[in-house]
């Protein structure tokens, strides 16, 4: 049931290799592909790209 949810919970993992993650929800109908956002990584104290992890 949860796997067919329209707004599933996803993890956004830092591409800087620090292991830092953000947890958010996304709308599958509007964003069917993997999400990529530029967000702040507090480990390296800089903005880096975060990618959706499955």
UniProtKB/Swiss-Prot annotation:
Ranges in coiled-coil conformation: none
Keywords assigned by UniProt, alphabetized: Ribonucleoprotein, Ribosomal protein
Classification via SUPFAM superfamilies: Zn-binding ribosomal proteins (SSF57829)
Swiss-Prot/TrEMBL GO biological process terms: translation
A Pfam family: Ribosomal_L33
InterPro entries: Ribosomal_bL33 (IPR001705), Ribosomal_bL33_sf (IPR038584), Ribosomal_zn-bd (IPR011332)
Gene Ontology molecular-function annotations: structural constituent of ribosome
Any Gene Ontology CC annotation: cytosolic large ribosomal subunit
Signal sequence interval, chain numbering: none
Similarity section: Belongs to the bacterial ribosomal protein bL33 family.
Protein name: Large ribosomal subunit protein bL33A
Organism: Saccharopolyspora erythraea (strain ATCC 11635 / DSM 40517 / JCM 4748 / NBRC 13426 / NCIMB 8594 / NRRL 2338)
GN (gene name): rpmG1
């Amino acid at each position: 049931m949860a796997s067919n949810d329209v707004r599933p919970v996803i993890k956004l993992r830092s591409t800087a290799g620090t292991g830092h993650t953000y947890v958010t929800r996304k709308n599958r109908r509007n964003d069917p592909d993997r999400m990529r956002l530029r967000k702040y990584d507090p480990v390296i104290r800089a903005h880096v790209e975060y990618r959706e992890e499955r």
